[in-house]
Amino acid sequence: LEKSSHQVKVKVMDASEIYDPEFRKLAHEKKPTAIIPVGSIEQHGAHLPITTDSDIVTEIASRLAKKCKFIVFPTISYGISFEHSPLVNISIQSRNLRGFLGDIVEQLYHSCEIIFLNGHHGNVESLNKMRKTMNRGYLEPYGLAPVRCYSYWHFMKHEFDHAGFVETSLMLAISDKVKMKKAKK
């Protein structure tokens, strides 16, 4: 906790600010929950940056970590965006994303419960396949907590749209990178 003169602020547990002895102590005393944002780099029109999906999911993960006392790990900014070719996107193959996320699970599952928070629709299938493989093969047979994967838009009341009202509104709330003069109605 950080104290100011009039209020107490709960600090986000950010993996980049946790050192080995502290992490080991946390893992030993209370198996913490790790939240790992997964985004993408792709076009979002002329008004939003190509990092929009990663920016949004990083902010949501940080807020969840603060509220729920999770440890937020660095965002995986590369995802599966081949559907946007030939427009700007930096995509990785599904098998590579699954393998990369699976490697993370193999390293963390003894120390943490794991939640992947997704910020890009193209990642959903790979995240679900990885989750099923890891849970069936590594975690459930040993009574360990399953890997969980969620996409942030499943918790929204408004219908999701790519580079439209929802993503623009979220980016306006968290960033000064939006160029509203270039937005189309």
Residue ranges and their predicted role:
Residues 2-185:
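Extended, histidine- and acidic-residue-enriched regions that form the cofactor-binding/catalytic faces
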